[in-house]
């Protein structure tokens, strides 16, 4: 397995929220990403999703802060989305009609970069063969298993 674990958009969203069981586990995951940068990756579609969700909910002031903080945290670990990623996502859509287009784009990017694990509260990832979803609520159990060797 690749040591780079994909961080989905709901991790920074929950970490910035209030009064939700996912808040502290997601905040811990972001602290882990800060301390062990080589262990985590995300993609530009996550940034777009953050912008979309906060603007659509009328909470763009907070959303801008969340977006900027996550982009800064992940600065050189945000993968682009290429045409080949979208073509693979389209193929996956034929096989997995219940999985959102965004999640399929993430899955395609993950395949390109060799990442098999995704940290997400979104159970749709459970329906994508070859991916292992790590629920943020289980960070106590799986937390040390995602860290790259040699402290990076």
Language model features: what each stretch is:
Residues 76-119:
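Active-site neighborhoods of divalent-metal-dependent phosphate/nucleic-acid chemistry enzymes
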Residues 1-42, 55-64, 140-152:
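Short, well-structured N-terminal submotif of metal-dependent ribonuclease cores
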